[in-house]
Regions:
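Acidic, low-complexity intrinsically disordered segments
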Residues: 1-202
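Short acidic/polar active-site loop segments enriched in Thr and Asp
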Residues: 27, 78, 214-216, 279, ...
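Structural beta-sheet core signal
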Residues: 31, 60, 246, 324-326
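Short strand->helix junction
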Residues: 35, 223, 330-331
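Short N-terminal helix/helix-N-cap motif within the alpha/beta-hydrolase-1
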Residues: 39-40, 69, 227-228, 335-336
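Catalytic cores of alpha/beta
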Residues: 69-74, 331-346
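Radical SAM [4Fe-4S] cluster-binding motif and immediate context
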Residues: 132-322, 343
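Conserved beta-strand->loop/alpha-helix structural units within folded catalytic cores of enzymes
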Residues: 320-327, 348-350
Length: 351
């Protein structure tokens, strides 16, 4: 189903009445709310679940959910996870199995009763996490919708899945929640860069192949933060014969080189990524103003030294689609700086 929404978005997939039927036999309902655009739909869903099944425990997670605690609690949510929730949800399960509904001692959790418990620590060794049970998900239904990351594909069906090779990011851009994820914060230092081992990554990819996945979306916030490691992984992915997409944005400085003081693009790395199966790349240019990049985007890109146009042209020559991320509307951003961003985006569209 595709239902147009009042805000211009389109809701795809199960509608609220379908969800109510699906969850009828369950005691606990978990809902992710990561992005602002999901707020209204999630709020309506929580309200409806609470109305029809007031006895069910409703748990929310995600950056958007935790940033609007009062709103979602008023809608009917019981608990909201404040940080990475793989371990938190286990603790919630233990409480439920004990016959209690007192969750006030669990770290990284907020409750409608008013408690907000800071995240005491985050998992450092990602290999300790169990491998996602992809085979238990109704993947075929998602493949038939063919709308990964909200974008339509020309194919009638896309056999895809999402993975993460790492978590966190070494940069602290102001517009990203990671800039607030620091040691001793309420949410814990989930912004710290943590890496899965190569063997763990290959194990996950092999499992995805076994269940029929052909297109893998890599969700890392900083895929190339460790270039030597990334190249080693890409070399091992070549034989997998999969199509890959980096969707959250590759730091463009990582796609450039500096030899004898002269900057250039890392053609070898782009060619390796193409050989590994990359078909889509997202370039986070962020702004046409160097001042804005320096102030709000950790100075991660130098518009003069890093030749974005050359990167785009090289990627396209390797038959990779390129998308760009651009931001504007900062409190002290001038009209001229906004226009410079629009002009730069138009230039890149023509490259």
């Amino acid at each position: 189903n595709e239902i147009p929404q009042s805000n211009g978005m389109v809701r795809v997939g199960m509608q609220t009445e379908d969800v109510l039927k699906e969850i009828e036999s369950f005691d606990v309902v978990g809902i992710s709310s990561i992005f602002t655009a999901q707020t209204r739909v999630v709020e309506e869903l929580v309200t409806s679940i609470n109305k029809h099944y007031p006895e069910k425990l409703i748990i929310l997670g995600g950056v958007n959910a935790r940033s609007q605690l009062e709103r979602f609690f008023n809608a009917g949510a019981d608990l909201i996870c404040l940080s990475e929730a793989e371990l938190t949800i286990v603790e919630i399960g233990k409480v439920l199995r004990s016959g209690s509904r007192d969750f006030s001692s669990i770290s990284g959790l907020a409750g409608k009763d008013g408690f907000i418990n800071k995240q005491l620590s985050v998992l450092q060794n990602l290999d300790e996490l169990p491998i996602p049970a992809w085979e238990m998900q109704p993947l075929k239904k998602y493949w038939e919708i063919a709308r990964p990351h909200g974008s339509g594909f020309s194919e009638e069906e896309v056999a895809y899945a999402s993975v993460m090779f790492s978590r966190g990011c070494p940069f602290k851009c102001h517009y990203c929640h990671i800039s607030q994820e620091i040691e001793n914060s309420t949410f814990g230092n989930v912004g710290a860069l943590r890496l899965k081992s190569e063997e763990r990554i290959l194990k996950e990819i092999n499992i995805l192949k076994e269940i029929g996945v052909k297109y893998v979306f890599i969700e890392d916030d900083s895929l190339l933060a460790k270039k030597k490691r990334a190249k080693s992984i890409f070399n091992r992915l070549i034989e997998m014969n999969l199509e890959l997409a980096d969707v959250n944005g590759i730091n463009l400085a990582h796609l450039c080189t500096k030899v004898k003081g002269k900057f250039g693009i890392d053609e070898e790395l782009l060619e390796l990524m193409s050989a590994a199966g990359f078909k889509k790349l997202t370039f986070p240019v962020e702004s046409g103003s160097q001042r804005i990049i320096d102030k709000y985007a950790t100075g991660k890109l130098d518009l003069i030294k890093h030749d974005v146009s050359a990167l785009i042209k090289k990627a396209k020559s390797l038959n990779m689609e390129v998308a760009g991320n651009y931001t504007f509307g900062y409190p002290d951003e001038s009209f001229f700086e906004m226009i410079s961003t629009f002009k730069l985006a138009r230039k890149h569209m023509a490259d």
